[in-house]
Amino acid sequence: MPGIKVKESESFEEAYRKFKKQTDRNLVVTEVRARRFFESKTEKRKKQKINAKKKMLKRLYMLRRYESKL
């Protein structure tokens, strides 16, 4: 569970920003959203396939972009 130590000199906005960054890093919000509704195994697999395809296309794009600079 995320938690931060606030210094006396820190403002509320700075402390809130730190807390928000920590929750984003720990994927707390995304996990809660994912568990909000039941997801069947087929839906999970479908999402995993879509994410894998996106990741592959992103890597391919980055590789082509890198090669074009050479």
Curated annotation (Swiss-Prot):
Keywords: Ribonucleoprotein, Ribosomal protein. Pfam families: Ribosomal_S21. InterPro entries: Ribosomal_bS21 (IPR001911), Ribosomal_bS21_sf (IPR038380). GO terms for biological process: translation. GO terms for molecular function: structural constituent of ribosome. It comes from the Bacteria. Belongs to the bacterial ribosomal protein bS21 family. This is Small ribosomal subunit protein bS21. It comes from Helicobacter hepaticus (strain ATCC 51449 / 3B1).
